[in-house]
Swiss-Prot record:
Lineage: Bacteria, Pseudomonadati, Pseudomonadota, Gammaproteobacteria, Enterobacterales
Gene3D superfamilies per UniProt: N-(1-d-carboxylethyl)-l-norvaline Dehydrogenase, domain 2, NAD(P)-binding Rossmann-like Domain
HAMAP family the UniProt entry points to: NAD_Glyc3P_dehydrog (MF_00394)
Similarity annotation: Belongs to the NAD-dependent glycerol-3-phosphate dehydrogenase family.
Broad class of the protein's primary localization: cytoplasm
E.C. numbers: 1.1.1.94
Protein name (record): Glycerol-3-phosphate dehydrogenase [NAD(P)+]
Gene Ontology MF: a single term: NAD binding
UniProt organism field: Klebsiella pneumoniae subsp. pneumoniae (strain ATCC 700721 / MGH 78578)
Transmembrane segments: none
Pathway(s) per entry: Membrane lipid metabolism; glycerophospholipid metabolism
Sites where the protein binds NADPH: 15-16, 36, 110, 143, 259, 283, 285
Keywords: Cytoplasm, Lipid biosynthesis, Lipid metabolism, NAD, NADP, Nucleotide-binding, Oxidoreductase, Phospholipid biosynthesis, Phospholipid metabolism
Amino acid sequence: MNALNAAMTVIGAGSYGTALAITLARNGHHVVLWGHDPKHIATLQHDRCNAAFLPDVPFPDTLHLESDLATALAASRDILVVVPSHVFGQVLRQIKPLMRSDARLVWATKGLEAETGRLLQDVAREALGDDIPLAVISGPTFAKELAAGLPTAISLAATDPQFAEDLQRLLHCGKSFRVYINPDFIGVQLGGAVKNVIAIGAGMSDGIGFGANARTALITRGLVEMSRLGAALGADPETFMGMAGLGDLVLTCTDNQSRNRRFGMMLGQGMDVQSAQDKIGQVVEGYRNTKEVRVLAQRLGVEMPITEEIYQVLYCGKIAREAALTLLGRARKDERSSN
């Protein structure tokens, strides 16, 4: 591979970053995958698979591993960032001085800025300036299924229409991976953050043993909270009926591949927060997302009772069953009321 002819550089060699890199490479593109740990990258290069997360999926020949950040960023104008939300800004500040002058940035990170609850678009603008084209991909995607080539669909939103079309062309595969362009840049970002919170709640409900009716009610009312917060930010309500909203929400709330759901189930069964996190063994994005979404909702004056009760369990020591009973005991309301 010539140092300047990769179609995409992927920043983040965890399970999802690796799965996206495999998908791009499987489409016939040269892809560079960078990770912060040189030993991990060396292992990936030696094994030609991500044995820790995706052991049964060999790397295509066009997937190239790189531990030197400058070399990785020189390889392509298009950069796909796939890192946890709490280090998103830090990573962007790290890559900025090494990016090409014609660089374009897309992320698959789901969440908001740690502590502030800011949208990742605002974090990106602050770190990289106003001129660089930005994009986000989001939707119901478990890394294992994506890497295996099982049918998957996502939403893609970008600040520049040409960038959106270019990304759709790179990612879309008629056999297994459908990429839908959505003009709602805010909504596509927000759905991925809120769904992680609601998935913890769905897991709690199942861990308590409340059954399918309760889980479905929680998912539905969680979608209401997502849409309510989105409306306050100027998002299009229809976005939350698509892949980045309802699609991702249903997947994460109902399948045990979801770390957020499994984490919530453990809490519902009586395990404490730290022990549940330790047992999961990987980042549980919804843990941080809950605090971030709550901060954003309070700043905008949006009532999100499910999010609030999950916050009380995660950060204030409330028992999951007590949180559920608080929600069930709320005053009678019109289904379409704003609170």
